Amino acid sequence: MRRFLFVAAVCTLIALPLAAQNTDIESLSGLQFNFGNPGARSLGMGGAFLGLADDASAAEANPAGLTILRKPEITLEGRNYQEQQVFTTSGTFPDLKRTGFSHYSQRIDATFASIVYPTKHFTFGAYYHEPLRNEGTGQVVPIRNDFTGQIKTDVPNFFLPVDANGNATGGPISAAACNKLRQTNPFACIEYTVLPFLSSVKVQEKTLGVAVAFQVGKFSFGAAARSQRFNETAFTFRVTPTGDFSSISVQATSDIRSNNDIAKDKTDLTFTGGFKWAPNDKFSAGGVYKQGAKFAAPTFAATENTNFEYVKVADTTFHIPDVYGLGVSFRPIPVLTINADAVRVKYSNLVDNFVSINATVRAIDKAYKAADALELHLGGEYFFSTKIPFAVRAGYWRDPQHSITYTGPITNSDEVGPAILFPKTKNQNHMSVGGGLAWPRFQIDFAYDRSDLFKVGSISMVTRF
């Protein structure tokens, strides 16, 4: 016997919390944030910059570093990226196949700009930063033969042993074990498949910030206030195996229940604070805390039960993770700088008071988790003292897995579905290279960072007055 699983679709629209934290729309499961420090110079050194923080990008990276600047300075950066979001597309639980769907920028986008002005006692800065931009679509559908139309790769499935009433008596079993049960009782095991779906996300966060820093002896302290603007639309559209509409689930930053409605921007005010200690010209250390913004992003759904009209499921909130980190910088010789950072990203903020669209899963306490990540960054810069000095840079950083993961029980079909679609992912190792040319009042830097799932190129310019 084969049944189709209404994974993550609306089972009921009652008894929901008035407010909750995020939801289980597939395109949000592995969302890639850009918590790295801005600037091609930092990117080329594996993002290790907190202990150095010696140019205008420090306004966002670590505002305490602004005190090292003695002249007004302007920075502009553009980035181009390509990333892959991975969905479970086929296989039998737990032996599943995952496929990457590429998201990329169509052009070089302006992702950071800052202006810094030092005075006798304070250094002031103002900046623009784009820490999050993601737009793309993935699908889990049967793959058919181009000539015969027959399915050659089906959507993910699993098998459950059941009693005489069709209730599961245990967790998923293999196809072979299911066939063995059916030899004595044809109805002792049921095969389930997920419904085909398409899931898409379009999300962007923009930041306008002002920073101030001052120095006391060998210590510098800085802070920034950030007005953060956020826009999001994420949805999953499900169909039946015959291609008929089944359900649609949507999270957006405003009410989008009318056909012509477009998600509107939400804003929040957050703060950052940092310090830097530079006992001599060979060593410095710094630290920073960045508060994550919170944005109202309600969740809606439409099914046959709602007469295919959108109904609000919950007033969910999108909480950008908090970030805090420490870094050191060492200059053994004047032309060589070595940096190391440790950055803690609280991805668990994404699932605080999480609400599932599936009623069965919603009843499970803390069914979803997102692991906090400790990013380790290491990089270096070497300057060649030529007529036009130029630098070469290289770095490495480790991005631990932090996707939204289903960790609840798997004793019935509604619970196995999320385990298939929201699995634990892999750590990512990033390698970066970069370079730059420096004139007395102008500097241009470029860098490239890559991992298995993410690639980004950057070019930035600095001018001093």
Where are these regions (language model features)?
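Outer-membrane beta-barrel porins/channels
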Residues: 21-43, 110-112, 116-465
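Short structured motifs
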Residues: 61-62, 364
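Outer-membrane beta-barrel translocator/receptor signature
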Residues: 40, 52-61, 67-151, 205
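Repetitive helical segments and hydrophobic/amphipathic motifs
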Residues: 11-12, 71
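Bacterial N-terminal signal peptides that target proteins for export
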Residues: 1-6
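N-terminal signal peptide c-region/cleavage motif recognized by signal peptidases
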Residues: 15-17
